[in-house]
Amino acid sequence: MAARKPGLIALFDVDGTLTAPRKEVTPEMLKFMKELRKVVTVGVVGGSDLVKISEQLGKTVTTDYDYCFSENGLVAHKDGKLIGTQSLKSFLGDEKLKEFINFTLHYIADLDIPIKRGTFIEFRSGMLNVSPIGRNCSQEERDEFEKYDKVHKIRQTMVSVLREKFAHLNLTFSIGGQISFDVFPQGWDKTYCLRYLEEFNEIHFFGDKTYKGGNDHEIYESERTAGHTVTSPEDTVKQCSDLFLGKDNGSS
């Protein structure tokens, strides 16, 4: 077996890269990642919290990979141990948070959209997730809202209003998924995790939303990474096989 290459890490987005969108990882992908880890250091970085990432990648996610970065790296694990945390609450303070949440809830209350459900704001340790329809809508309602939003630009308009109103807080607004958008301080995108990877001089990042506005864009564009756009978990396997495993290393 080839020794692991020092100074090199393969870093993966979760949703759409290691798993199909919002689905669990396949046994085939887990097996492939285990093989890959024999030749390179491997890390995962997802925008979701550790609970949601564990639902997709499995409960042993923090030990299955050398690095596990949840909430874009605001919660960081190395070799199964917590090595760093940052929180929105300690960064902004309760007064500013309350001001933002109150305004947002008033805005949603006045929104005239076909249906509303519940959980309009989800408070995570590193970000707020805002959903005009409410996160506990059904999959069917989620699909319908996505279509409605494409025409009526509900989220885009709301983000414009919030961006202007709270310009003094230096927040980033990232529209993703079907029904919501994320709100976090500038610089708290996936590049945040790179501060834990100073020992690596070659960082290969793999993600599917690498276009401008996508939540993989900043880390893909970073001068510290070699960015790779993937179209599916199968494409991830193919690109990594070509890059790291080669023909003579394909079996163990």
From Swiss-Prot:
| Residue intervals passing through the bilayer | none
GO terms under cellular component: cytosol
Localization: Cytoplasm
Q: Name one Pfam family in it.
A: PMM
Record EC number: 5.4.2.8
Instruction: Write down the InterPro entries for this protein, in alphabetical order.
Output: HAD-like_sf (IPR036412), HAD-SF_hydro_IIB (IPR006379), HAD_sf (IPR023214), PMM (IPR005002), PMM_cap (IPR043169)
Source domain of life: Eukaryota
Q: Has the keyword Coiled coil been applied to this entry?
A: no
Chain residues that bind Mg(2+) 2: 220, 225
Residues annotated for alpha-D-mannose 1-phosphate binding in this entry: 22, 124, 135, 142, 180, 182
Q: List positions binding Mg(2+) 1.
A: 13, 15, 208
Q: What class of enzyme is it?
A: isomerase
Q: What is the required cofactor set for this protein?
A: Mg(2+)
Q: In which pathway does it act?
A: Nucleotide-sugar biosynthesis; GDP-alpha-D-mannose biosynthesis; alpha-D-mannose 1-phosphate from D-fructose 6-phosphate: step 2/2
Q: Write out the similarity annotation.
A: Belongs to the eukaryotic PMM family.
The record's subunit annotation is: Homodimer.
Matching NCBIfam families, A to Z? Answer: HAD-SF-IIB
Q: What does this protein do?
A: Catalyzes the interconversion of mannose-6-phosphate to mannose-1-phosphate, the precursor for the synthesis of GDP-mannose. GDP-mannose is an essential sugar nucleotide for the synthesis of D-mannose-containing cell wall polysaccharides (galactomannans and glucomannans), glycolipids, glycoproteins and the antioxidant L-ascorbate.
Q: What is this protein called?
A: Phosphomannomutase
In its UniProt entry, the species of origin is given as Nicotiana tabacum
Ranked from the top, the taxonomy reads: Eukaryota, Viridiplantae, Streptophyta, Embryophyta, Tracheophyta
